[in-house]
């Protein structure tokens, strides 16, 4: 079984447009992971459904979203922090009239083998 890595993402200097986009990203807890990722990466589930894509674009074997709102994002991923996901989320939010966006991420492994900010 994979070690679970919890990530907590917060923002400052985020535009109203980006806040609204985040609030609509995961309308409820039944929202599929591929639906959330599809909005961030502008991809279909078929385009994202392979190990190579996950490795090159998310940085972990899988990811789940525990909470998504303009107040922050919390995720759980397998084996490692999804650093490439963080980068792509930042790029997406910056493109939504948030040129001064600041994003903080903290993560920890359940063992704990590692932690980071």
Q: What is each stretch, according to the model?
A:
Residues 1-117:
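Long, contiguous binding/interaction regions
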